[in-house]
Amino acid sequence: MSRIFWCLFFTVWPIIAIVVCAISPAMDWAFPGNREAATPLGQRIDDLFFLITGIVTVTFIGTMGALSYVLWKGSKNEDEKGWYSHGSHNLEVIWTIVPAGVLLFIALYQLDVWAIYRVRDHENRDVGPRPSHLVAEVTARQFEWRIRYPAPGTKFTTYKQIKAWLAKPHAGDVYAVNKLFVHLNRETLIYLKSADVQHAFFVPDLRVKQDAMPGQSIDIWFTVNKSGKFNLTCAELCGWGHYKMRGEVEAVEDLQAKLKELKDLQDYDGVTPPGTVPAGASEEATP
């Protein structure tokens, strides 16, 4: 009886697991669920994720099927003696070469995605970013995200200018807390820093994740191709308030107008109407 029980157990629960995995996208249980990535690179990461999931699923079904067959066949006759083997050179070669071949295929298949994400330069650094790019500095600190933008209308033509801007605050800079605005359908360049401990910049809908390390400035490239608001969270345990270190990334059509709006609110003194320059005042130069 116990043999039949264990045979059924190792046969039924894999079937249940496969059914649950099959219906999970429709129930919004799956990761990344039924929400498509909002970046082109994120969509390629999803394709890679589902490819690996498919390979693992086929392997799981084959392994559990073989186990169920052996259990069922062995439970028919309790008097039948088992066959003991001290190993098979041919089998060892097969189950070494096949997994190695699968891993090699995955490694080669993902090289292009990994190159775009971590290796390949997005621009010629001697020339600089395109004027349409957004450049912003994001500083993680317990327990919030501090964002600094260059003054509205600022255009960097070389990376030397970007480094000079990052080195210190400048007149006309725009600041925000826990709210990052980015161009829709244009590349965004973020320089990520930490003011205290290790944090992690994580936007699930964009499939973007990067640790923020104290003493380092790490650049992140991504392009948001869907309008909307996306949750920004810290994915590294950073202290007692880690749970509330949340923000938002919003993709907008007219980023310069949004930055101008933020600048007006930032300069508002409670008396002078936003968007006006007080008499005698002049705008200072920006990098």
Question: Predicted segments — roles?
Answer:
Residues 59-76:
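Transmembrane alpha-helical segments in integral membrane proteins
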Residues 9-15:
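Hydrophobic alpha-helical transmembrane signal-anchor segments
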Residues 1-9:
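N-terminal membrane topogenic signal
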Residues 2, 17-50, 71-287:
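Non-transmembrane, membrane-proximal soluble domains of secreted or membrane proteins
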Residues 46-60:
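Alpha-helical transmembrane segments
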